[in-house]
A protein has these predicted regions:
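Acidic, surface-exposed loops and disordered segments
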Residues: 1-177
Length: 177
């Protein structure tokens, strides 16, 4: 967490924003996300993997055939710039971040990190804490090399000996239901 360290929190937010922007404005990476995007409750229930998107406007655009998963929006389109702006507002209100760093990066380590994150997510939820993974800056494509290096430096993880396996923004939300 970093709510009591405003300068560190600002760095986390800036790296997350840059990773988000790069992924959205790089057509091939945006298309990767579209391929695993689950739009609406029905798709989420049918496919328990991938990215869940429940925004009513997007659900209706998809139902009407006006939301393409085969073509990325132009980087300067409202679909992209609007998401970047909206997410910037969310990041600005983020009170903290959580991260998991491992020694090494073999498949067993990756799976164990995922299992540990799932346990943390469940415990956090039980206490009213919400988490959103910020994996954009942890990916390994050329365009995101700078945010990747920045987040590893910020978290004092030295690749390849150490890997940031999970990085999430955390905060509080009203109970659902």
């Amino acid at each position: 967490m970093c709510a009591d360290q405003p300068a560190v929190l600002t760095q986390h937010r800036a790296i997350a924003a840059e990773g988000w922007r790069i992924e959205l404005q790089t057509p091939r990476t945006f298309l990767e996300s579209l391929k695993v995007m689950r739009i609406g409750a029905k798709e989420v229930a049918e496919h328990r993997d991938g990215l869940s998107l429940l925004d009513p406007m997007v659900v209706w655009l998809s139902r009407l055939g006006l939301f393409s998963r085969s073509e990325a929006p132009k980087p300067d389109s409202y679909a992209i710039t609007g998401q970047i702006k909206d997410f910037g507002v969310k990041l600005d209100s983020t009170p903290g971040f959580l991260w998991m760093v491992s020694d090494g990066n073999d498949r067993i380590t990756q799976v164990n990190a995922g299992r540990a994150y799932a346990r943390v997510q469940l415990a956090a939820t039980a206490h009213g804490v919400v988490m959103q993974p910020m994996q954009q800056a942890l990916q390994e494509f050329a365009e995101v090399a700078r945010p990747y290096a920045d987040v590893h430096r910020l978290l004092q993880a030295s690749p390849p000996a150490q890997t940031v396996q999970m990085w999430a923004r955390v905060g509080f939300a009203a109970p659902v239901g």
